[in-house]
A protein has these predicted regions:
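Glycine-rich phosphate-binding loop and adjoining beta1-alpha1-beta2 segment
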Residues: 17-54
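Substrate/ligand-engaging "lid" and interaction regions
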Residues: 156-157, 161-219
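N-terminal Rossmann-like dinucleotide-binding module
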Residues: 1-22, 30
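N-terminal Rossmann-like NAD(P) cofactor-binding module of classical short-chain dehydrogenase/reductase
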Residues: 69, 73-79
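Gly/Ser/Thr-rich loops at beta-strand to alpha-helix junctions
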Residues: 4-8, 34-36, 83, 138-146, ...
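Short acidic low-complexity segments
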Residues: 58-71
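Rossmann-fold NAD(P)-binding glycine/threonine-rich loop
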Residues: 47, 81-153
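Short, surface-exposed basic-aromatic patches at helix termini and helix-loop junctions that form
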Residues: 17-20, 47-51, 129, 148-158, ...
Length: 219
């Protein structure tokens, strides 16, 4: 849901890379009128990506939520109520008061939550109706707040996701000259406002070394 997002090809690429662990037969792309022209481009690209990978995955694009959510195993949410114009307003709210303009916390995050939560709960009501056993994978920001709303006010199984910890792990692995899978980073906090508490590599905490390397690179 929110298929016109530029992040969709990255998600599809992840599905292709993990097709042996997570075999799928169909992907249903969903968007609204405002994002339809972008979603049509994503539809064509998604089909070509699966074809190039040799995977027989059916891909459709729809605005019909019942069609999209009936008998599915996973629902991925990555929409933005109000589109990019709303993001501009959210970030300028904070800037107006001398704070960082951000869409996941602070004034901007709170404003975005006011729009994202009602829309997400509306989607969850349809998930409960048409696919009660499905998992909601929530990328919609502010991810932590939206996910908490789903947990508190619906019966939908949900996981809140953010790519910041993953990007942090990638950067740390480069500093350590290590494989990403061998680096464990313990993080705490809400999405886009997180702290690395420990970096474990080869059985040792490498936090001090990593911090020194990052500080040296930024001097």
């Amino acid at each position: 849901i929110g298929a016109g997002s530029s992040y969709t090809p990255e998600l599809i690429d992840g599905l292709i890379a993990r097709s042996s662990q997570l075999p799928i037969s169909e992907v249903r792309l969903v968007d609204i009128d405002e994002g339809w022209h972008k979603a049509e481009i994503i539809l064509s690209l998604t089909r070509r990506m699966f074809e190039h990978a040799g995977l027989p995955v059916k891909v459709i694009l729809t605005q019909d939520r019942k069609e999209a959510l009936t008998d599915v195993d996973f629902v991925c949410s990555q929409f933005r109520v109000g589109c990019l114009d709303a993001r501009i307003r959210d970030e300028r709210i904070s800037l107006k008061h001398g704070m960082l303009g951000q869409e996941t916390n602070g004034l901007g995050g709170f404003a975005k939550a006011q729009r994202s939560i009602p829309a997400t709960l509306d989607i969850c009501r349809d998930i409960e109706k048409y696919s009660p056993d499905a998992w909601l994978l929530n990328f919609t920001n502010p991810s932590g707040i939206v996910t908490e709303a789903v947990l508190r006010h619906t019966k939908v199984k949900v996981v809140g996701l953010c790519n910041v910890p993953v990007l942090m792990q990638k950067g740390i692995a480069q500093v350590l000259n290590a494989e990403e899978k061998d680096v464990f980073v313990q993080v705490a906090g809400l999405n886009h406002f997180i702290f690395a508490r420990q970096v474990n590599y080869q059985g040792k905490d490498q936090m001090d070394f990593v911090l020194e390397e990052f500080l040296d690179d930024n001097q």
